[in-house]
Amino acid sequence: MTYVTYLHKPSSIRNAVFCKFVNASSWNVIVAKVNCLEVYSYENNRLCLITSANIFAKIVNVKAFKPVSSPTDHIIVATDSFRYFTLFWDANDNTVSNGIKIQDCSERSLRESQSGPLLLVDPFQRVICLHVYQGLLTIIPIFKSKKRFMTSHNNPSLHDNFSVRIQELNVVDIAMLYNSSRPSLAVLYKDSKSIVHLSTYKINVREQEIDEDDVVCHDIEEGKLIPSENGGVFVFGEMYVYYISKDIQVSKLLLTYPITAFSPSISNDPETGLDSSIYIVADESGMLYKFKALFTDETVSMELEKLGESSIASCLIALPDNHLFVGSHFNNSVLLQLPSITKNNHKLEILQNFVNIAPISDFIIDDDQTGSSIITCSGAYKDGTLRIIRNSINIENVALIEMEGIKDFFSVSFRANYDNYIFLSLICETRAIIVSPEGVFSANHDLSCEESTIFVSTIYGNSQILQITTKEIRLFDGKKLHSWISPMSITCGSSFADNVCVAVAGGLILFFEGITEVGRYQCDTEVSSLCFTEENVVYVGLWSADIIMLTYCQDGISLTHSLKLTDIPRSIVYSQKYGDDGGTLYVSTNNGYVLMFNFQNGQVIEHSLRRNQLGVAPIILKHFDSKEKNAIFALGEKPQLMYYESDKLVITPLSCTEMLNISSYVNPSLGVNMLYCTNSYISLAKMSEIRSLNVQTVSVKGFPRRICSNSLFYFVLCMQLEESIGTQEQRLLSFLRVYEKNTLSEIAHHKFNEYEMVESIILMNDDKRVVVGTGFNFPDQDAPDSGRLMVFEMTSDNNIEMQAEHKVQGSVNTLVLYKHLIVAGINASVCIFEYEHGTMHVRNSIRTPTYTIDISVNQDEIIAADLMKSITVLQFIDDQLIEVARDYHPLWATSVEILSERKYFVTEADGNAVILLRDNVSPQLSDRKKLRWYKKFYLGELINKTRHCTFIEPQDKSLVTPQLLCATVDGSLMIVGDAGMSNTPLLLQLQDNIRKVIPSFGGLSHKEWKEYRGENETSPSDLIDGSLIESILGLREPILNEIVNGGHEGTKLDISVQDLKSIIENLEKLHP
Amino acid sequence: MNMDIGKALSDVGGLRDITSRANNSLPPTPDSSPAAPSKKHKLYDFLESRGKIETPRKRIVFEKKPLLHKPVHIQKKPAQLCKELLIRQLGGSRSHPFSTKTSRHVGGRLNLETYYSRPSECLMMLNQLPFCLGFANNESLLAVCTETGALELFDSRFYDRQNEENQPSARRIHGWLAHNNAIFSVNFSKDDSLLATSSGDQTSKVFDLSTQQCITRLGRRGVDGYHSHSVKQVNFCNDSPYNLVSCSRDGSIIFWDMRTHGITIDGEHFQKPVLRIRKAHENSGRDCSITSATWLPQSTSQVISSCSANSALKLWDLRTVHTVRPLPAATTPELTTSKRDFGVTNVCTSPDGERIYAASRDSIIYEYSSRHLNSGFCKTYKDPRLRISSFYVKLACSPDGATLACGGGVQDKTSGVVVFDTTRNCSSSAMLTGGHTKDVTAVDWSSEGQLASISDDGSVRVWNSSLHGSAANLREKNFSEIFYWGFSEK
């Protein structure tokens, strides 16, 4: 049975409301993400997540309203199947509760409105208006009577809806006007000649009628309506802004781009609420404006003031204190501080970032020693980014100190149970800082000096601080400072217990007890690094690419061991295994490798050497003291953490990428366990012990469409939209951009021709060349009729060079590698090319139904997904492409991937997914040629790309084997797996019990939500929804008990609650 | 903003753009008229809206003083497939981030004035009249049969490498003599592996398309128990390539199943009927010709039939029909609209099987709901140009169910196909003119939305739909430039 769960939940925000949801005294922001509602509270200039609610339907719109008797606002949620329900905050239970359960207003016989569903609330809280179908308005009166509300607990907040007819079919936008006498509407619509008009209506709730009002306006522009408090309505057209009311009709040229979202600003006084004389408006270019309208007796003056640039907004919410929440589909959603005149700042300041990786056009999985990372092509229009998603250790900054030029730092715990001394080593200065138990920092002038510090620790049983600088060894007992001044400059130093060891220029190693010299050893070359471990053993790295092991005892110093390396060691750390004689010596070399030698009783275990390349520049190794892990920081181009987890070396990246140096620092009162510095600041931070999904953003000029990678580079196909207002023309520019993997910087690019759209890219077998497919999209053509296949290679001087070019008759929508051949989907055909001696040859081609969208291959099959007509199975036999089987159902495929032998996974544009089966042993030919629908279900989001890969390697005892990874338009990454024959019955029954026991929001059925939705039919889904099963883990014990025992007519499961928990924990291991 | 392809997307794939273009052909208003459009800047005003006024609501009153400004209307470019796909991939455009039915809008074209046919898409049959045609269900393969029994196969989307315009043309692929008598209908099986023809020789034949060999015959001439007159139509069942239905002028409908045993005589294989319904449409005691018998899609048991004597349609359900005294599962009531009975020339179904369209001799197309035949027609399609004068006129519903095409259009001595929009409540229609000189009889749709028509002048034409370019420009050109072209006209 198919098991589907999220690796990354959808993050695109299309709707948000601002209301007093939780209590009447504070504001909440409620955000809708595909099928999830998130309730945020607005406190201390931040939005804090209070709770999230999974809705078993796609949320189309959310609005807040206030029933007269209720102290708080309720919200109404409109879903994609033309239904609505209400939710409110139950103050007793502190949860979101159902108000009105699901109400169906679907009318199969009517045509859907072309502008999409609209949900509107009367500003005077009398009715809610829903426009879904052409020419039909559904009016939902809000409950008025206080009495009935108080008496029954199951209080209705809304009356039953009724429908009224309007004459306008092609509605552009609707607004509810500020009309105190009767609820009224303004409708912006297009007539049959595409001319835009505005008409108004009044709703008669009692008679369930609608009457035409007398405010009309003809021949204006298409745009958005914003109701004004003065009773009129603003029309934000494509360039002009109009104000239309009974008395005044004016227009003014204000805009350069159509607006996408608006929000009335909020006055600081929570009692008064909205201030609708000022609006915040966002346009398509991501620009934010403040819109002011000044009313006089006869006219209105309108003013638009530019505030700054942000993500392209799909919803805006103005918050008190000049804050603004921008919800976006195309980029991160942000909480902004708007510029204010009083505070004299003119910049938009981002206060909070809500990561959004939607829309994902394409993705790849990149594996290296540090584990897998997913690179997604995210964003669109001006907001294109590459996102690198890693399962990494998260570092949370607790405090930042701005300071530049720091080379290294040390912390030491001197007569305290926390690290109370911090030494900051600059290029020619050391600053010592004492941290008080309360976390107050003060400078210590005794320990600060004019040299940089190399090493700090405590000796003599934590009674003295040992500080090794480039000139001297200093001992500090809290009051007095003793020092030994070196004749030559000290290059490295280390200590263990009371013994100190330093290396000075010239390759001389000196041993001390305290500051009394006890021995010396002359090396052949300069010392590059040194590490003093227990039993008086010193590991010394030399510039001659050797590591020697010196043992110090009463008799003198002897060389006990030496290792010859190929590269020069730069940093050495010895890490002991707990409760064992052995340990591991980590050596970083000057070319970015980290070598690991395992030691046992002072001897290297043979063949224990491991080499890991973590970068190209020398890596700084540092010990990290943690309760559970004996971990080593490795700081190169990317900061990483190495540790052993059940005898397996794990190298994990850290979420912060700009680190220069790092050190463990223990201070429980501050809740930090590490200290790191970047170019500009030092941070006291908390490093989490467990790995989680972290997203790194690389901004891209234009927006990325396709990506592939070899061992060194990312090849990204990007597009740029250049718009000129004057001619109202749009230019599409396409680029191939090459990013270096380590630095993530663009090193080369190739620009394609005008009108050429980049469609596909693959890496060839030799790991060097890439093939790019394009299509010419001339403005006077409906479908592309020409395109190019191009072969590129990186030259040695980091330039991208075109090696071959082949013209084809259509757009190359998709490319895959099949053995050594290139399979291309070109318009309505599949072609096989061979690249030989710098030219492309056509080997064969075959027609496909309408338009090839995606191709997937395995050993002997080529599966082509079609724009409208499902998939076709092809085979390439004896230089001939032949059609083996086909699915005759209409299916608007978006991606295809082979699931297993003769099973194909196809995703569809409406969010369905189908698994098709090829029956190649059926006795009847017609059955062999026909693909069978094996399983079908609803995923809820349009999937752009499916790949056969796993992000986290499944463990042996895993209940579900992950198979595919799907990236969606709404920014989610889904794992499609197989639950296996033996686990399926249990998981299915568990899912069934959860459906029965856990009440759903709005009374929606999870079963219906996952049903396949065809044009005319819905059918039960063959799917186990992982996110549903995982959602119960946090629930209370009695509920889990009920699930196990099959409450509400469920089936009793043969497991205990403890088993249930371990099952879910097992399932959760599929994703971080 | 013009760059907004997504807007067009949300307008059913750019429907609006075309309507705005098409409406430029409105009758011109005199310059003195208040509603005259200014060339550069339009000046607009509002009617006085204070108090109750008797003037009609949507009239524009002209006044010198401009109050509202509006930028010059620039024609919007049509949405293109590639861009639509791009927008779909990005989850909508910026202004319309929400369109619930994103998928259906891609490539969804619903404008009747977009059809055109180039000279290269016209083929002439020499010395014989084409009688019927049929498109393959998955390919751009067109079969045309003639009065002499010849069967010709065409590729309606043939890409010629030498062709500079790089546009598809129609090309003959193959042909053979299927019958020694006129062929009245031709039909492909759902997977296009088989082809069935019905002929005036009282039999039907089933051909294997890959070998063009007749694998079986449905009916034996002069033998009792089979059709005893011309077979008017033969149809494959949608869900099974083995089930067929045929109907004849003798008033009988016969169901065939190719999995049953037949008999082989002189090396020729004959199928035996599974069920024969005699006198299927009895009209006041007399037999009448069954003009059409077609399966309901998504059903292996239900067949709709029509006759030449009256407007009644009958639904036969194999699950309930009695072998001795067969009775239909449902019958349409008598029409009360017309004074006398008109026969039905052809019946077709919408792809989802919900609607049945019947072309009646009174030049009206009646739409029935297949589930409620008894309650009568639910809609009619009329056009003054539509003349269903002969029983050779056929109609066809497009694969997306949105357009209905019918032969028999006549306008000022030219003939053509009449197309109707079935999705709207008010019926809108257009005629594809210029392509044929004599009566257009049969039409059919390909799976890719191409339309083919045949005419008594011997021509076979393939019509393409394009949002812009060809079809729109053609109407504005003069006669000599568009000679031998066909295009749609409102």
Swiss-Prot record, chain A:
InterPro entries: Beta-prop_RSE1/DDB1/CPSF1_1st, Cleavage/polyA-sp_fac_asu_C, Quinoprotein_ADH-like_sf, RSE1/DDB1/CFT1/CPSF1, WD40/YVTN_repeat-like_dom_sf. Keywords: Cell cycle, DNA damage, DNA repair, DNA-binding, Nucleus, Ubl conjugation pathway. It holds the Pfam family Beta-prop_RSE1_2nd. It is found in: Nucleus. One of its GO terms (cellular component) is site of double-strand break. GO terms for molecular function: DNA binding. GO terms for biological process: DNA repair; double-strand break repair via homologous recombination; nuclear mRNA surveillance of meiosis-specific transcripts; proteasome-mediated ubiquitin-dependent protein catabolic process; protein ubiquitination; transcription-coupled nucleotide-excision repair. Pathway: Protein modification; protein ubiquitination. SUPFAM superfamilies: Quinoprotein alcohol dehydrogenase-like. Interacts with csn1, csn2, cdt2, ckn1, iqw1 and wdr21. Belongs to the DDB1 family. Component of an E3 ubiquitin-protein ligase that includes cul4. Required for ubiquitination and the subsequent degradation of the DNA replication licensing factor cdt1 and of the ribonucleotide reductase inhibitor spd1. Also required for transcription-coupled nucleotide excision repair. This is DNA damage-binding protein 1.
Curated annotation (Swiss-Prot), chain B:
It is found in: Nucleus. Pathway: Protein modification; protein ubiquitination. WD repeats lie at residues 178-208, 226-257, 285-317, 339-369, 387-419, 435-464. Residues 18-40 are annotated as: Disordered. SUPFAM superfamilies: WD40 repeat-like. Keywords: Cell cycle, Cell division, Meiosis, Mitosis, Nucleus, Repeat, Ubl conjugation pathway, WD repeat. InterPro entries: G-protein_beta_WD-40_rep, WD-repeat_CDT2_adapter, WD40/YVTN_repeat-like_dom_sf, WD40_repeat_CS, WD40_repeat_dom_sf, WD40_rpt. Pfam families: WD40. GO terms for biological process: cell division; meiotic cell cycle; proteasome-mediated ubiquitin-dependent protein catabolic process; protein ubiquitination; regulation of double-strand break repair; ubiquitin-dependent protein catabolic process. One of its GO terms (molecular function) is protein-macromolecule adaptor activity. Gene3D superfamilies: YVTN repeat-like/Quinoprotein amine dehydrogenase. GO terms for cellular component: Cul4-RING E3 ubiquitin ligase complex; nucleus. Its main location: nucleus. Transmembrane segments: none annotated. Component of the DCX(DTL) E3 ubiquitin ligase complex, at least composed of cul4, ddb1, cdt2 and pip1. Belongs to the WD repeat cdt2 family. Substrate-specific adapter of a DCX (DDB1-CUL4-X-box) E3 ubiquitin-protein ligase complex required for DNA replication during mitosis and meiosis. The DCX(DTL) complex, also named CRL4(CDT2) complex, mediates the polyubiquitination and subsequent degradation of cdt1 and spd1. Involved in the regulation of mitotic and pre-meiotic S-phase progression. PANTHER family: DENTICLELESS PROTEIN HOMOLOG (PTHR22852:SF0), LETHAL 2 DENTICLELESS PROTEIN RETINOIC ACID-REGULATED NUCLEAR MATRIX-ASSOCIATED PROTEIN (PTHR22852). This is Cell division cycle protein cdt2.
